[in-house]
């Protein structure tokens, strides 16, 4: 049963604010609108909000105004610098949020920044949750994301009705724990991506049909969610973005900042960095197979 802080979340009463209407964010907030919540969106380019306005969404002129108009504000943006500016800036969400309000940052960002946001929120008698997600654009469209939540357990439980419109919520611990969980997730995804890319290139160089090779191995020990989601796209060289390659570089970079010995992660980051350096940072993660192809003399 959801916690009644400060009163039970209800679509007819709880005002939701949203920042971030990119590949995933627009689908995620659409689920919240469909559930009957009142949603106000802030975007630097108001033209991007037109579709959400047709679904009943309103717009705010600044992050501060969004905070003033909302009980809960969700953010899912590009990087930690964006998060800092939008939440902690002089015209940021927390400068407008009333006591008792809650921020939920779903960006893949730094655990230390999540703890900083939490501390500032509490100083203002507000609350903050870090809640990055996994599942890509398909999970966002289908409302089947996995949400890694860090913060106060009672607040995360209180948020459950609205967060469950977007996927499954996994509470990980105190502030920053959600972000640490997401970084660990990306370490595994990055490693799986490189292994899958190398397997496909090996199959091609060995004279096998990469698609048939995938069919042959997917139900054995080599099978994985990464293979299911990205294998055929890699094999046919469909690099439509479900998540930008440049974001994988960012995420693996945050893992490197943890100052732990992770040689595989360091190598994987280098390979994705090469992809970005080739001008392919806005392609999907699966495009890293082209880096492996080039290393093996394939065009």
Swiss-Prot record:
Residues of the active site: 182
GO terms, molecular function: 3-hydroxyisobutyrate dehydrogenase activity; NAD binding; NADP binding
Gene Ontology biological-process entries: valine catabolic process
Record carries keyword Phosphoprotein: no
Enzyme class: oxidoreductase
SUPFAM superfamilies, per database record: 6-phosphogluconate dehydrogenase C-terminal domain-like, NAD(P)-binding Rossmann-fold domains
Keywords, ordered alphabetically: Branched-chain amino acid catabolism, Mitochondrion, NAD, Oxidoreductase
Catalytic activity, as annotated: 3-hydroxy-2-methylpropanoate + NAD(+) = 2-methyl-3-oxopropanoate + NADH + H(+)
GO cellular component: mitochondrion
PANTHER family registered for this protein in UniProt: 3-HYDROXYISOBUTYRATE DEHYDROGENASE-LIKE 1, MITOCHONDRIAL-RELATED, 3-HYDROXYISOBUTYRATE DEHYDROGENASE-LIKE 2, MITOCHONDRIAL-RELATED
Residue stretches spanning the membrane: none
InterPro entries per UniProt: 6-PGluconate_DH-like_C_sf (IPR008927), 6PGD_dom2 (IPR013328), 6PGDH_NADP-bd (IPR006115), HIBADH-like_NADP-bd (IPR029154), HIBADH-related (IPR015815), NAD(P)-bd_dom_sf (IPR036291)
Highest taxon listed in the record's lineage: Eukaryota
Name this polypeptide is given: Probable 3-hydroxyisobutyrate dehydrogenase-like 2, mitochondrial
Origin species: Arabidopsis thaliana
Record's subcellular location: Mitochondrion
EC number: 1.1.1.31
Family (UniProt): Belongs to the HIBADH-related family. 3-hydroxyisobutyrate dehydrogenase subfamily.
Cystines in this chain: none
Residue sites binding NAD(+) per the record: 14-43, 108, 250
Pathway the protein contributes to: Amino-acid degradation; L-valine degradation
């Amino acid at each position: 049963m959801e916690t009644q802080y400060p009163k039970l979340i209800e679509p007819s009463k709880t005002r939701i604010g949203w920042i971030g209407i990119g590949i995933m964010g627009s689908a995620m907030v659409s689920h919240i609108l469909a559930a009957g919540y009142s949603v106000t969106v802030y975007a630097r380019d108001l033209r991007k909000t037109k579709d959400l306005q047709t679904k009943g969404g309103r717009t705010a002129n600044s992050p501060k105004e969004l905070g003033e108009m909302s009980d809960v504000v969700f953010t899912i943006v590009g990087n930690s610098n964006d998060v800092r500016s939008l939440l902690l800036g002089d015209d940021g969400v927390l400068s407008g949020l009333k006591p008792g309000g809650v921020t939920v940052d779903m960006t893949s960002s730094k655990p230390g920044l999540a703890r900083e946001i939490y501390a500032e929120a509490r100083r203002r008698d507000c609350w903050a949750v870090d809640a990055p997600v996994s599942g890509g654009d398909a999970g966002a469209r289908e409302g089947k994301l996995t949400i890694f939540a860090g913060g106060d357990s009672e607040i995360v439980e209180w948020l459950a009705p609205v967060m469950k419109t977007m996927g499954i919520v996994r509470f990980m611990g105190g502030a920053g724990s959600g972000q640490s969980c997401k970084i660990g997730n990306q370490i595994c995804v990055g490693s799986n991506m490189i292994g899958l890319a190398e397997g496909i290139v090996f199959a091609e160089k060995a004279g096998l049909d990469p698609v048939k090779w995938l069919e042959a191995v997917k139900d054995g020990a080599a099978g994985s969610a990464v293979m299911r989601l990205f294998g055929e796209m890699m094999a046919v060289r469909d690099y439509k973005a479900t998540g930008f390659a440049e974001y994988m570089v960012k995420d693996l970079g945050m893992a490197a900042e943890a100052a732990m010995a992770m040689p595989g992660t360091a190598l994987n980051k280098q390979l994705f960095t090469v992809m970005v350096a080739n001008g392919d940072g806005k392609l999907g993660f699966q495009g890293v197979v082209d880096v492996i192809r080039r290393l093996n003399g394939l065009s």
